[in-house]
Design a protein with these regions (language model features):
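Feature captures hydrophobic
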Residues: 1-143
């Protein structure tokens, strides 16, 4: 059964976290991420011309190839993240559909990163697998 974004946001982010933990490839390419530094992510989906609802925030705990937590939050300042990845709804839609890569979107300015860009680029293979696993969640979009 497909999960619909944004109305099924809670279930969707939990499903993505499960996909990451089921992925041997993510376990391998994410090895070392978040070790001796805060590798947790805040993913921020902003309204745009396609979606005029509320901002969506997902917290994803990542450490050494494991997703330690994955949930939607209404309080982005209430979670301890080391990196934030921000973009508009339509851009996230393209990412989840694999029409845009995470690193390509970042380099083109379609996504913004708060955090250590150099470290993120060192783990670009993990970003690719994370995007593939997001695409593996059966997703429909309301807008």
């Amino acid at each position: 059964m497909a999960l619909t974004l944004p109305s099924d946001a809670d279930e969707w982010i939990e499903a993505w976290g499960e996909k990451l933990n089921e992925s041997d490839e993510y376990s391998e390419v994410g090895e070392g991420w978040g070790v001796d530094f805060n590798g947790d992510f805040l993913f921020h989906i902003r309204p745009d011309d396609t979606y005029d609802g509320e901002d969506l925030y997902f917290f994803v705990g990542l450490e050494d190839g494991v997703c330690t937590d994955a949930f939607r939050t209404d309080d982005p300042d209430g979670v301890d993240w080391g990196f934030a990845f921000r973009g508009e709804y339509s851009t996230w839609k393209r990412l989840i559909r694999q029409d845009l890569g995470a690193i390509d979107g970042l380099m083109s300015g379609e996504f913004e990163l708060d955090g250590d860009m150099q470290r993120t680029l060192q783990y670009s293979d993990a970003a690719v697998v994370m995007t593939e696993e997001a695409a593996a969640v059966d997703t429909e979009f309301e807008y």
